[in-house]
Amino acid sequence: MLEMILKIDESIARCFFVKKVLVVEGDTEQVVLTETINRMPYDLKNQILSDWHIVRARGKAAIIPLVKYLKAMTIDVYVIHDGDFGVDGAERFNEPIKNALSDDDKLVVLKNCIEDVLGYSAPKSDKPFVAYKHIQDNWTDWSSIPELW
């Protein structure tokens, strides 16, 4: 048992100490959410940080087993992922993710990708850095975050 505990990813281990877990597709979503939280008013930020934990699935396909595992551990799970509509290799995971979560109220499927929501075209590379740079250049505080986001 101890060996298993030692092998659990630190990010997954934190899931046991919060009320809700948000599973995101990858690094870009993690960066955007972290920067969003950093700009929240003090009380809201503290409430979010004490009640929620964000876990990167590190790929759309990995969301499914991660959700199943967290649900089996009776953890309250929510998911945000790109819709990737028209992208064959990625769109096919939308329905299995929805089925694994089995609660549409806890699922947010972005129209296409997070860059669309943020208002710029998705780059071919360095997506997390480009998102971070976009936020640094455009968001000064909570009130400057786009309403669509």
What is each stretch, according to the model?
Residues 1-149:
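Acidic, divalent-metal-binding catalytic cores of TOPRIM
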